[in-house]
Regions:
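N-terminal mature ectodomain segment of secretory-pathway/periplasmic proteins
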Residues: 13-84
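Gly/Pro-enriched, hydrophobic low-complexity segments
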Residues: 57, 61-69, 77-79, 125-207
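Glycine-rich, flexible loop segments associated with nucleotide phosphate handling
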Residues: 109-112, 118, 159-164
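Acidic/charged, solvent-exposed loop-and-adjacent secondary-structure segments enriched in E/D, K/R, S/T
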Residues: 79-116
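Short, solvent-exposed helix-to-loop capping segments enriched in aromatics
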Residues: 23-26, 111-125
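Short amphipathic beta-strand/extended segments with alternating polar/hydrophobic composition
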Residues: 45-49, 68-74, 87-102, 188-191
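Sec-dependent N-terminal signal peptides
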Residues: 1-10
Length: 207
């Protein structure tokens, strides 16, 4: 019995923690959270909502407080309300590639969901390694710290390393930090106030 306990304690939490996290997220119908991103362009704070098969809503807190973006996969367009919530006035209809609706690092609204983020991490993992460090806590929540690092000479969109902190129970990312080949931080993203499979109002993603 003691031997079985020791084996269980020393076994990896997941054979592939990134694939396990992605599988959990792919099983969700949607989620909402507060996203805090820090990079060379400063800080962005967004109240973010996602619903399958790809509906996205961003309510901006910083730097463009009050702006609202909604992406609908059925139209392939982003509706932008620069100064207020939808329903009060007509929004601008833009392509996802328009610079007005891209982040300071060039991220597109239609490629902003957590599943896409993890698939980007997997691209680095395919050309390198993933390892789980000692159990830790983030904001008082038990978490798995996973490091994904490309082999020398490899990079995916400048990124050669990701540090991820996954919620120990849900495997949902709580924080993701990316680094370039010089070891300099490209971006740090914190995901807070996470609500999985919420009941969105019927007009939450309406244009």
């Amino acid at each position: 019995m003691l031997l079985l306990v020791l084996v269980a304690m020393s076994a990896p939490l997941a054979e592939d923690p990134i694939a396990a996290s992605l599988a959990r997220i792919d099983a969700l119908q949607g989620y909402r959270l507060t996203l805090r991103s820090q990079g060379n362009g400063g800080e962005e704070v967004i109240r973010y909502s996602y619903q399958r098969p790809g509906y996205v809503r961003m309510d901006m807190e910083t730097p463009y407080r009050g702006a609202v973006l909604i992406y609908r996969p059925d139209t392939g367009r982003v509706q932008l309300w620069p100064f207020g919530a939808p329903g009060r006035r007509a929004g601008l209809s833009l392509r996802p590639t328009n610079r007005l609706v891209r982040s300071s690092r060039g991220h597109r609204v239609d490629q902003s969901d957590v599943g896409t983020l993890l698939r980007n991490v997997q691209q680095v993992q395919r050309h390198g390694t993933a390892r789980v460090l000692e159990p830790t806590e983030l904001d008082g929540r038990p978490a798995q710290h996973v490091v994904v690092e490309a082999e020398p000479g490899r990079a995916v969109r400048e990124v050669v390393r990701y540090d991820l902190w996954l919620d120990d129970e849900t495997l949902f990312p709580l924080r993701v930090v990316s680094y370039d080949r010089r070891g300099e931080r490209l971006e740090s993203v914190r995901l807070e106030n996470i609500d999985l499979d919420p009941d969105f109002p019927p007009d939450h993603f309406a244009p």
